[in-house]
Amino acid sequence: MGFFRHLFSLSLCALSLAIPSKLIGLENTQDVIPNSYIVVMKSTISEAEFQTHQAWASKIHRRNLGERDETLGGLDGLKTTFEFEGLKGYSGAFDKRTIELISRNPAVDYVEVDRVVKLDAITTQRNAPSWGLGRISHKSAGSSDFVFDDSAGSGITIYGVDTGIDIKHPEFGGRATWGTNTVDNEDTDQNGHGTHTAGTFAGATYGIAKKANVIAVKVLNAQGTGSTSGVIQGIQWCTDHAGRNGLKGKAAMNLSLGIRGSTVFNRVAEAAQQSGIFLAVAAGNDGFSPASARGVCTAAATNSQDAATSWSNYGSVVAVYGPGADIISAYPNEDTATLSGTSMASPHVCGVGAYLMALEGIGPDKVCDRIKELAVESVTNQKLNTTRKLLYNGSGA
């Protein structure tokens, strides 16, 4: 019997090897996390088939490690799964032989290498005067007054997918709560970036949607780094939370982080948007691939003179420009800081999106089009094939 089981196992391997490998992302090795992969299943796979596949993948992983008579430190096999409408998959750490077999499995659509995710922000100085709020509420530059409707994002929940948020900061006035942590065991913002972006989209002083609720979703550590798989896990938590709490159609998400061109990330972002959450995404700085997922609102950055910043990414995927240079906002421990980057432009877009959802009652799938409709054509120094539209909240000023 042992002989026949071994023969059957070899036959399965031979069958798998007859199917072309579907491992993608190897053409660019920058920021790749060694031996870490994201497996995406065919869209037609059932829940039962998905469970069966996971058991098979785990068995293959254990067998291959056993044949090498070694544990290969860090190769833990299957770690986390994700499930969105029409999209199932998992992430894990596997040796090359195992991931090759997984990639050739008929139930697998493709396998993508996992990558390091980084922040885009550039710290400049503390406690400098802010200009972004005045700019987005006036059709012309020059005013420091923020003009807005008193609804101010009331009834909308914003997920800050970032380094965490100092939820006790006075800027949030009890409207901020902790959600989840997919990167470490420190349920606080040890970096400051997440608190800063949250202060822009929903802070009482520096924010746009001043009455929105805020939920901290930590996917990046104190150094501002994480992984594609960890970000996916965080987005999964947001969609599940929105579904359980009746927030779909009344929720927004800010993603001020840099992910190099990722097919699976784009699909996850699209799935989150289609589930009923408005997504604002940073275009990226200095060569980072812009978020090109359909339906998300991608933000590039301008300075106080309405000029596109030299470090902001560009291209046809940019939906709108937003203030991104020398932006003052909340910082951990009741502090403030001034940061620059498309990371700062994205929360302006997110805040205006939440503001419009509350004010006009529009759904998440209509928000980005409405933002582009309201925006003013005032950006200068923009690059080829990039919009001139600058974020505007429609105040009438």
Swiss-Prot record:
Keyword list, A-Z: Glycoprotein, Hydrolase, Protease, Secreted, Serine protease, Signal, Virulence, Zymogen
Similarity field: Belongs to the peptidase S8 family.
Stated name of the protein: Subtilisin-like protease 9
Swiss-Prot/TrEMBL GO biological process terms: proteolysis
Functional note: Secreted subtilisin-like serine protease with keratinolytic activity that contributes to pathogenicity.
Active-site residues (renumbered): 162 (charge relay system), 193 (charge relay system), 343 (charge relay system)
Gene3D superfamilies: Peptidase S8 propeptide/proteinase inhibitor I9, Peptidase S8/S53 domain
Inhibitor I9 domain: residues covered: 36-119
A molecular function GO annotation: serine-type endopeptidase activity
Residues annotated as glycosylated: 254, 385, 393
SUPFAM superfamilies: Protease propeptides/inhibitors (SSF54897), Subtilisin-like (SSF52743)
EC number: 3.4.21.-
Subcellular location(s) per record: Secreted
PROSITE patterns named in the record: SUBTILASE (PS51892), SUBTILASE_SER (PS00138)
Database matches in InterPro entries: PCSK9_ProteinaseK-like, Peptidase_S8/S53_dom, Peptidase_S8/S53_dom_sf, Peptidase_S8_Ser-AS, Peptidase_S8_subtilisin-like, Peptidase_S8_subtilisin-rel, S8pro/Inhibitor_I9, S8pro/Inhibitor_I9_sf
Iron-sulfur as UniProt keyword: no
Organism: Trichophyton verrucosum (strain HKI 0517)
Domain Peptidase S8: 130-397
Propeptide: 21-120
GO cellular component, one term: extracellular region
Signal peptide (from-to): 1-20
Catalytic class of the enzyme: hydrolase
